[in-house]
Amino acid sequence: MTNQSTIDKLIEMRLTTMADAFRTQLDDPKFKEVPFEDRFGMLVDIEYSNRKNNRQKRLIRNAGFDQPEASIMDINYTSGRKLNKDLINRLATCEYISEHRNLFITGATGCGKTYMACAFGMEACKQYYNTRYVRMPDLLMDLDIARTEGNYRKVMAKYSNPVLLILDEWMLLKPTDTEQKDIFEILHRRRKKSSTIFCSQYVFEEWYDQLGGEASPLADAIIDRIAHDSYQINITSIDAEHDRSMREVYGLDKTLRE
């Protein structure tokens, strides 16, 4: 078998990175002195690393992050917000995902909830967890359209199956009875099987009322499915009188606006 034939077969098997590395070895006289086992190991390592990198990129792309540049390393701890750095670093290990636990990120608009949630999502993708980000209004609209078009089960699976689901703008608006049923169904399917990050302007204690309180038969059921297995990060201001939105902190300098 000729070397070109070997290269062609590698390409046919979609081992293109391995094929390119093999060409490099053939063109470099130094590799003739390297034992076969070592050369073969190098080829396998290169192909393996490339596939893992491509998988990670695909997971990040498919997650649909609102802020794909978000990073745990870039979280600003000097911006006047109360942040538990130890808890954030512990959650960044993604151990909560392997334990099937949830995370509540709450705080006023502009405090950095979405950025932090996307940063946790990026860490999940780096550890090859299937992740999906969605705004709650978009999720409910998606399910409503699916109900009309007859593909409700497929869309429900889209949000039930990810190992990590990030629900942004959670309880921003009070859901209708039908929307509550959709929320209950998703959370019921995910409980003890996967993890969910909830981002909300309302603190956890206010979610029950946003769900309709005693007037809603599903409010208790929904809260019960998420309350007992969740970490909480409540982002508050150190000095309320000088509180600034993170959008303002990182926005266009006032001197350049006019």
Residue ranges and their predicted role:
Residues 11, 16-67:
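Interdomain "pre-motor" coupling segment immediately N-terminal to P-loop NTPase/helicase cores
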Residues 100-116:
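Walker A/P-loop nucleotide-binding motif
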Residues 70-94:
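N-terminal pre-Walker A segment at the start of P-loop NTPase domains
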Residues 101, 128-130, 161-164, 192-198:
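Loop/turn-to-beta-strand initiation segments
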Residues 75, 117, 135:
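Conserved hydrophobic/aromatic pocket- or pore-lining residues that grip, position, or stack substrates
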Residues 121-134:
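Post-Walker A helix-loop "phosphate-sensing" segment adjacent to the P-loop in P-loop NTPases
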